[in-house]
A protein has these predicted regions:
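Extracytoplasmic cell-surface/polysaccharide-interacting catalytic and binding patches
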Residues: 2-152, 156-271
Length: 271
């Protein structure tokens, strides 16, 4: 092959390579333009993908709502802290059981609340209750007085029998003024008990008078005081004490309150 022919071939090859390169570039440009055009004409695909990604992210990081939680916390209108634990309501840390606030049948006071209303020491009452009562009992004894727990913890089903037995002689609307329905009795709380004779005469005894004037010093209140029947929902019971701690008991005593007034709640059956 002559030198002239070689030069012609080289030029031809260069032209072919240039043309091929140009065609490749044009094809790439067309492909890019086509893709951009398709995305701009169908923006919903991008939006939907974004929503899907966001939803997935949220479901992975946000815990599901659990309707079986045993404890919930909220704030009442009166500004008190309210906790519901295992079906029982605590206001500012104080367990409230009355006609508006019940305890579940499973709630058993302290240590399972073994069924015995006259044990020594009282089974089912919390240790701080027993300790405070023992101190009060000894101080009363030093004054020549005899106080003792006649009825302590009662289970849901024990109270059910008590209430039903009363209903055999009195109509329910009358029984409701002096006995609690099952689940609404403070005796189930493990913080309440009855003293001595468990009747109206206790208020006029030396023991009854001493208890009324001094029980707050040991953390107890007369749970259903005289003159508060419309608020507590029960008749005056001088023998029924409830442990709430010395500070709260003293405040209630000095301000002539009942527990409902102190906690800002009512005591009314819904039916």
């Amino acid at each position: 092959m002559s030198s002239k022919d070689k030069n012609v071939k080289v030029r031809t090859d260069r032209v072919v390579i240039s043309v091929i390169t140009l065609l490749i570039l044009v094809a790439l440009i067309v492909l890019i333009v086509s893709k951009v055009s398709n995305n701009s004409n169908n923006p919903s695909q991008s939006v939907n993908q974004t929503v899907q990604d966001t939803t997935t992210s949220t479901s992975d990081t946000t815990p599901p709502t659990d309707t079986t939680l045993e404890e919930t916390t909220t704030t009442s209108q009166s500004g008190h802290n309210v906790e519901v634990i295992d079906g029982c309501t605590y206001i500012d840390g104080i367990l409230i059981i009355n006609k508006s606030y019940s305890a579940s049948p499973e709630y058993q006071g302290y240590n399972g609340g073994l069924e015995d209303t006259k044990p020594t020491p009282p089974i089912g009452l919390f240790p701080e209750v027993i300790e405070s009562f023992n101190t009060m009992q000894q101080d009363a004894k030093n004054q020549g007085l005899d106080i003792y727990i006649a009825s302590g913890y009662r289970s849901y089903y024990y109270q059910l029998n008590v209430y039903n037995r009363y209903c055999e002689t009195d109509p329910p609307e009358v029984v409701d003024t002096y006995s609690a329905r099952a689940g609404y009795s403070e005796h189930q709380s493990g913080y309440a008990f009855d003293l001595n004779s468990i009747d109206d005469s206790f208020a006029d005894t030396d023991e009854g008078k001493w208890v009324a004037e001094n029980c707050h010093k040991y953390g107890f209140i007369v749970r259903f005081p005289k003159g508060k029947e419309d608020i507590t929902g029960y008749q005056y019971e001088s023998w029924h004490l409830r442990y709430v701690g010395v500070d709260v008991a003293t405040y209630i005593y000095e301000n002539n309150l009942c527990l409902e007034e102190y906690l800002g709640v009512d005591s009314v059956y819904k039916d």
